[in-house]
């Protein structure tokens, strides 16, 4: 069927900010879809609130709106643009829910807008638990016994009927939000109450637990002519009971017999046909390991995280083809872009194994609840490709960037047997490493399978890895066992550990004996047909399929898995760098390990190597490709950390040199550089042990800011108020040593701002200065940032520009750099310099219209700013005001404290743009799900040192019609200053009148809570904050953010005064 000609303009709804459960995979899907629709000649209008995406670049769609994805703003855009249709199936749960809302509000009918891809009725049937159950019964597809409930009592009654354990699944939520497994009535009451609150339709499904079954996923496609195919099937290493986003996954399935595979394949195709989905769809099934019994768990009627994984695992571009199907094209008339010869109707075949391992944020959240269940907790994931399970699993382990390079964590050798077993039974994020440790201790795989219900086949692979370790230990220097270990994915470093030599020595032994990897192509057809994709993975076999081209090449290192502190912003910069390399006439090669991102789409670069970002893996590619050099500036700390070992091995690092990177990162060298350049910084010292730290702090004076050197995202950074707290920090938070000193700085309470600059060594272009709303002490990634600055004097801005130029030239910076300043009493101090692209690059690029990463890349390759038509100095400001606001995923992470401080906690960002600061702030708050009504109740519970300031805020809230509630000390202070506040209790003093009770009752519109001493973990405060998060009540832990919210409310209200 040819494409439709009755529609001309299509709106694509994006997925908004990155949160746990909805990450970069939707930037990849949305970008593909917009380009595919443009390719077919349609006019595309894109709405998305996340500036850190490639999708929101001007060239991706005909019109790009970076606006909140709320009914208010999407309706405005619909009325203005009048599209013929909306494609909502590529914006994750956000896009789907928005489409449903627009439809229910009658807006689509009123404007005559059609929904493409999947009909509303199908979305309802897949997402509404009741309708889904009905459909499965009609299709005679088995589902676990279940019941839909709208109250906690109904849930308890049903569970009593079928018996525990049961699973709670709220309707229309993302990534299992609010759901969970309940072993008894107490757990059920707690989880069901929370789930009903988080479900937009106050509905949950209570179902019999089938934990322990194999969890299998099928990624299927269907078109309007009812052609349907399976793109990829996947098997979870972890059985049912752990969210698939938190499970290790292998593709294709590994333990199914042909009969089982056909049975589940038929079920999946039957379901997609019954739902009449046009596009991609993901079906999750549970299979009894001891019989042919299976259950359908759920269906996602849209492109999902699994679709991104399936696309990268097979090379089959699901989102691109789904977009074309939505406008009427069929699978048998579209060419598969990977082979360029076969049609899209051809099911992919794999001659390799793909492993995906989730990346969790618990390195940032010491107190977080690490136990895994049906609610997703991972922020990102890595994927690795090998010719066997062992190889792909070990490559994935070393891609995680959690300080391991094998399926082993050395510190687990100190764990007792009892603790080891407990951790294996109650799965946490690091269970793979506990299982491997148990095998090393001699536990049998049968015992472990009984404890975990993980298939013996997978545990046998872990045993095989251990057997190779044992053999390596017995045969030091043996070439045959070296070959065997490399064929099974062992890193040189691991072999070196066992053989008690250096990794360099192992590498030399390998190269001397010609044990080098070959690169195989991902071609969707198991090499059956000629294929044109330049998409490769390494393995230790014979024939090499990656041929070095005649053209000179440049390698760009990506940023690996998405985690807190290193998000999709770095992928954005990577993709732009590649474009500039290609424009400059070089071949652009990307190395990365993240399946969710645009950079690992094989059509972005000239060659893609899907490999771990470690010295060994990168070096292997460099030896094959012999590039002009490597660019490390755009891959965050991941790539920067590789600069030194690569340079040491003789590789050319393009842009800022390693010695200069060191001058910015090494504390003593940096201090010296600032002294030489005559630039002030807060007084500080380095300490290599506890006593030195205490001596430094006494000299500087408390409060001090303490942190380890060489980190990203403010890891283990704290503001410390006293000597006792400092001692406690030195003992618990860091492992200080002469190699890893701790920095002790005077903590200046001032306003903070930052600059991204681009330098060619002579001239320095400063696109703009971003002013932070929260004062120093809140990590820059968690602060709201405003461009152009609203309160900085012209003199301060001129000083910032002057210091930026001095630093860029003084540190010999070629390319990008990011500098953070604090301003106190009109004096500008430099806090830190990062000689690389930072997380603000996409935001600043968009608001100034300067393609920063592309310009930086051209400078790195030898151009000058003058040649490119840019002047030295600060670029003229834009007319509009732009606000970048952070977005957090606390609802997904139990026991993580939402208090803001110097350690970064946000997972994503949104942007608001308008003619005034207040309007831009309003949009930024709306886009980040901080919605405050015009009146209501606000609770203040404030630390002594901020009560004065809080009083002024409370008065302003009161003036616009809010009622003020406060805890005892705060209420007393307010009363002494003539502001009446209703007294509420903190916790448990009076259960009907404490803060959690108010929060549960829905009577509170916001909570403002500040804390004095951050070191003493205050359980009351943490419980108050977590009750606000659980019930979706806006929570402000920085008074500056609350001040911004009051400004918005004031600007939207009218004054009513008696004369």
Swiss-Prot record:
Mn(2+) 4 binds at residues 832, 834. InterPro entries: ATP-grasp, ATP_grasp_subdomain_1, CarbamoylP_synth_lsu, CarbamoylP_synth_lsu_oligo, CarbamoylP_synth_lsu_oligo_sf, CbamoylP_synth_lsu-like_ATP-bd, CbamoylP_synth_lsu_CPSase_dom, MGS-like_dom. ATP 2 binds at residues 707, 746, 748, 752, 777-780, 820, 832. Pfam families: CPSase_L_D2, CPSase_L_D3, MGS. One of its GO terms (cellular component) is cytoplasm. Residues 930-1059 form the MGS-like domain. HAMAP family: CPSase_L_chain_A, CPSase_L_chain_B. Large subunit of the glutamine-dependent carbamoyl phosphate synthetase (CPSase). CPSase catalyzes the formation of carbamoyl phosphate from the ammonia moiety of glutamine, carbonate, and phosphate donated by ATP, constituting the first step of 2 biosynthetic pathways, one leading to arginine and/or urea and the other to pyrimidine nucleotides. Composed of two chains; the small (or glutamine) chain promotes the hydrolysis of glutamine to ammonia, which is used by the large (or ammonia) chain to synthesize carbamoyl phosphate. Tetramer of heterodimers (alpha,beta)4. This is Carbamoyl phosphate synthase large chain. It comes from Streptococcus mutans serotype c (strain ATCC 700610 / UA159). The lineage of its organism: Bacteria, Bacillati, Bacillota, Bacilli, Lactobacillales. The gene is carB.
